[in-house]
Structures are given as C-alpha cells and as structure tokens.
C-alpha cells in the first residue's frame, strides 16, 4: 500500500461484487465474498486508521467494522456518514470494540440534538459538516486533522458515488465473484446520478490482479 502525502486521508475503496457489478440481490442477500476474501479485507482493515461506511450499510447489514477475521492488536476508527442521523442506538457499530465517529450535517432540530447527546454519552464522537448532506471534502479535512491518515472505504453505491465524484478515492480494490445477480433494482458498486460523459468519469490504472478462492482480485490506482 503506497501512501501519498496529501492534506487528506489516503482512501482505499474496497468492494466485493458479482461479475455484473452487484453488491447484493434484489432481496439484499449479499453473500458474495469467500472466506479468503474476508481475510484479505481484514488484513487491509488492520493496516488503516479508519473504516468508513454510509448509513445505508449500517441499516441494512448492521456491521461491526472491526478486525476479527485475523489476529490484530488494534481496531481502526469506525466512521459512519449519516446526514439525517438515522443510526440506531443499538447498532453494533456503536459498541465499545472500537472508537466510532458519526458524521452528520450542521442542520439541527431538538430531536437531533437530543440524539447527539445520547450518542456522546455512549462514547461516540459526532462531527457536523455540511448542510443538507455531509460535505465529504470537509469531512476528510476533519478526519485528517484528527490523525486519521488512511481510510478503508466500504461504502454502498451512494457513498461510493459521492467519494468518487469529489475525487477523494486514491485506490480501488475489487473482489469479483463468479456470480450473476441481475436486477435493475439490485445495489451496485457506484450509484448516484453518474457522470454524463466519458471525459468526466473516474479513470483507473490496473496495478495488480490475482486469483483468490473462486474469484479474482483487481487492484487499481485512481488517475488524478
């Protein structure tokens, strides 16, 4: 893993997907990665400062976002992008296994402020940045200043789109499983409104590839 000295964390976008780019079936069955790939991901987790997901991933999967498939003496900071502060108070990402940062907007109301107080009493740090939706560029500045210099992005299609659109991703690591899910409503790696032209799109440089279990891993550098 090559670290680039910038005033933002080095972002690795990781995904396990089917050959047709799906993250799950239309019924949210996301059994895609093999055990070998899960170990690969946890090795990356063990070597970064933070793991970032969107609130959609928390609501659908209730992940722990810790290093538990391999032996490790540390867990990265867990970062959840949650514009409307919808995180359930019993979500596993809020447990004491690792530090958690919830990124939400500066928009406020009485109910939201009460929930922030509850989260802070639970030991969760709440960061406010942006109006309407979380300002991802500003969030990266805040996280960098907190000493988080590298992040594994394990987002769904919405957060991934926001990060790619803002030019914040440095590296892409993809496990492709030999499966076809289909379904126009099935979640994909990158959603959002999409780029209008090829000239605007994110361009990648293939750095490495190898077989893993029944699938294949592709590693790319994002061209800046």
From Swiss-Prot:
InterPro entries (alphabetical): DHFR-like_dom_sf (IPR024072), Rib_reduct_arc (IPR006401), RibD_C (IPR011549), RibDG_C (IPR002734), Riboflavin_Biosynth_HTPR (IPR050765)
GO BP annotations, alphabetical order: riboflavin biosynthetic process
Any Pfam family: RibD_C
Domain of life from the UniProt record: Archaea
Catalytic activity field: 2,5-diamino-6-(1-D-ribitylamino)pyrimidin-4(3H)-one 5'-phosphate + NADP(+) = 2,5-diamino-6-(1-D-ribosylamino)pyrimidin-4(3H)-one 5'-phosphate + NADPH + H(+); 2,5-diamino-6-(1-D-ribitylamino)pyrimidin-4(3H)-one 5'-phosphate + NAD(+) = 2,5-diamino-6-(1-D-ribosylamino)pyrimidin-4(3H)-one 5'-phosphate + NADH + H(+)
One function term, GO molecular function aspect: protein dimerization activity
TM region positions: none
Enzyme Commission identifier(s): 1.1.1.302
Gene3D superfamilies in UniProt: Dihydrofolate Reductase, subunit A
Residues annotated as binding NADP(+): 16, 57, 61, 83-86, 134, 156-159
Keywords tagged on the record: NAD, NADP, Oxidoreductase, Riboflavin biosynthesis
Broad EC category: oxidoreductase
Pathway linked to the protein: Cofactor biosynthesis; riboflavin biosynthesis
Family, as annotated: Belongs to the HTP reductase family.
Subunit text: Homodimer.
Function in brief: Catalyzes an early step in riboflavin biosynthesis, the NAD(P)H-dependent reduction of the ribose side chain of 2,5-diamino-6-ribosylamino-4(3H)-pyrimidinone 5'-phosphate, yielding 2,5-diamino-6-ribitylamino-4(3H)-pyrimidinone 5'-phosphate. The beta anomer is the authentic substrate, and the alpha anomer can serve as substrate subsequent to spontaneous anomerization. NADPH and NADH function equally well as the reductants. Does not catalyze the reduction of 5-amino-6-(5-phospho-D-ribosylamino)uracil to 5-amino-6-(5-phospho-D-ribitylamino)uracil.
Miscellaneous remark of the record: The protein sequence in PubMed:16730025 comes from protein expressed and processed in E.coli. Using chirally deuterated NADPH, the enzyme was shown to be A-type reductase catalyzing the transfer of deuterium from the 4(R) position of NADPH to the 1' (S) position of the substrate.
Protein name as catalogued: 2,5-diamino-6-ribosylamino-4(3H)-pyrimidinone 5'-phosphate reductase
């Amino acid at each position: 893993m090559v670290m680039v000295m910038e005033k933002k964390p080095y972002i690795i976008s990781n995904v396990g997907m089917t050959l047709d780019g799906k993250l799950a079936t239309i019924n949210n069955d996301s059994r895609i990665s093999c055990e070998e790939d899960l170990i690969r991901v946890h090795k990356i987790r063990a070597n970064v400062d933070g793991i970032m997901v969107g609130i959609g991933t928390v609501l659908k999967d209730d992940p722990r976002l810790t290093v538990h498939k391999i032996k490790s003496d540390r867990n990265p900071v867990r970062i959840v992008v949650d514009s409307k502060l919808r995180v359930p108070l019993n979500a596993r990402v809020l447990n004491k296994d690792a530090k958690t940062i919830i990124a939400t907007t500066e928009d406020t109301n009485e109910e939201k402020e009460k929930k922030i107080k509850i989260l802070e009493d639970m030991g969760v740090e709440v960061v406010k940045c942006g109006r309407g939706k979380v300002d991802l560029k500003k969030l990266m500045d805040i996280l960098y200043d907190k000493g988080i210099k590298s992040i594994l992005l394990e987002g769904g299609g919405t957060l991934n789109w926001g990060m790619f659109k803002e030019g914040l991703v440095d590296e892409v690591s993809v496990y492709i499983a030999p499966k076809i899910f289909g379904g126009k409503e099935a979640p994909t790696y990158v959603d959002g409104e999409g780029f209008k032209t090829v000239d605007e799109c994110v361009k990648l440089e293939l750095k490495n590839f190898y077989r893993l279990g029944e699938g294949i891993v592709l590693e790319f550098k994002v061209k800046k």
